[in-house]
């Protein structure tokens, strides 16, 4: 039986509608490690440097917004390209081969840890807006129990006023982030967020849940094979809960207004320590950390733009020393901070690479400045 034109038109419209529905279906991506544990706070980008978002505390991003191929990156794992093919899927990430050799404990009065940090402000409309790198010499006196630090840095920005403003308003804060912490993270979290009844629950298999009176805010995962302890937590959520618990209504409303403006916000905080066979670690066992805020915001044209503010810190040298050895180590670790030297340093010390799309934008920024 032949179809009339009207019937053909109806069927064609139905097919088009079905295809539109299928193409609009969310492609849910989950990131896991080789043991099947979720990897939270993985950055997800398109191959042309546009941010899609960040996986949540359970390693999930609900929709990659129709991207055919995505670039995924996390400070503790190797970056990876993944073909979505219009389907939901699971991505297994490989550990980055970053890490200092085991430190030999010696009867020396001082502990020396050099940390390297990098900061970037990224906007998928303009690229990398600000970039800053620095070195901090951390010296811990084992007798007096005091920590002394000194930091050197260099920075580049798309606009000179941004470089000046950031240095004035946040430079000291960033430098402080690069200092090793004398208290374990668990104690720091409990101390800072005591108002929200933070507790740490052992779930077995080397995994602990960090929660407050409103639910989960993070996880602690011990990887005995790698000899590492990994902390992933959402400081933004914990801070908002603390304002609520303290009854600070004005600050809470201000925070809620900011969250409404900064859509799909993720505060992706991460710390990594080396642990011994008994699961113990000391301040000098610090390996790396990340503080990252990611969100969508409308520009002046009313278009949605993704923004990322990120601070990453890496331990690059450590030793038990006396005063003369300390002086020599500091001298050896001095470096002229040109972009080429920075890239060579990162490669030599196996610093995890930035997402290829961000690295490309960073290269453009540095050339523009030079």
Regions found by a protein language model. Give the residues of each.
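Short, ordered, surface-exposed loop/turn motifs in non-cytosolic proteins
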Residues: 34-48
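Bacterial Sec-dependent N-terminal signal peptides
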Residues: 1-29
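Surface-exposed, low-complexity/disordered segments
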Residues: 92-370
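Short, acidic Ser/Thr/Gly-rich low-complexity loop/linker segments typical of extracellular
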Residues: 50-60
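A short, amphipathic beta-strand motif
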Residues: 27-36, 59, 91, 103
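A short, solvent-exposed loop/turn motif at the edges and junctions
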Residues: 71-83
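Hydrophobic beta-strand segments
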Residues: 42-46, 70, 105
């Amino acid at each position: 039986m032949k179809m009339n034109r009207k019937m053909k038109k109806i069927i064609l419209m139905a097919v088009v509608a079905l295809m539109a529905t299928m193409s609009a279906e969310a492609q849910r991506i989950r990131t896991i490690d080789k043991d099947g544990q979720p990897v939270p706070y993985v950055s997800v980008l398109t191959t042309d440097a546009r941010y899609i978002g960040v996986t949540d505390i359970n390693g999930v991003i609900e929709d990659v917004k129709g991207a055919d191929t995505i670039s995924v990156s996390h400070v503790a794992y190797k970056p990876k390209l993944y073909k979505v093919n219009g389907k939901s899927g699971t991505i297994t990430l490989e550990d980055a081969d970053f890490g200092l050799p085991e430190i030999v404990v010696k009867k020396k009065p001082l502990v020396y840890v050099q940390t390297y940090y990098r900061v970037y402000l990224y906007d998928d409309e303009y690229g990398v807006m600000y970039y800053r790198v620095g070195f901090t010499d951390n010296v811990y006196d084992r007798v007096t129990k005091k920590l002394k630090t000194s930091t050197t840095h260099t920075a580049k920005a798309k606009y000179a006023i941004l470089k000046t403003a950031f240095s004035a308003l946040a430079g000291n804060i960033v430098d402080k982030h690069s200092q090793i912490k004398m208290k374990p993270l668990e104690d720091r979290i409990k101390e800072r967020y005591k108002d929200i009844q933070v507790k740490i629950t052992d779930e077995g298999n080397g995994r602990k849940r960090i929660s407050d009176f409103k639910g989960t805010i993070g996880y602690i995962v011990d990887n005995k094979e790698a000899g590492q302890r990994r902390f992933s937590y959402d400081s933004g959520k914990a801070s908002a809960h603390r304002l609520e618990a303290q009854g600070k209504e004005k600050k809470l409303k201000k925070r809620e207004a900011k969250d409404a403006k900064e859509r799909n916000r993720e505060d992706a905080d991460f710390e990594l320590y080396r642990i011994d066979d008994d699961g113990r670690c000391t301040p000098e066992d610090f390996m790396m950390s990340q503080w990252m805020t990611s969100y969508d915001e409308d520009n002046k044209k009313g278009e949605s733009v993704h923004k990322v503010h990120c601070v990453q810190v890496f331990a690059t040298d450590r030793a038990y020393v006396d005063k003369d050895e300390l002086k020599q180590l500091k001298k050896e670790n001095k470096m002229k901070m040109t972009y080429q030297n920075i890239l060579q340093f990162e490669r030599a010390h196996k610093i995890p690479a930035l997402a290829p799309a961000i690295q490309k934008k960073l290269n453009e920024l540095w050339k523009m400045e030079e």
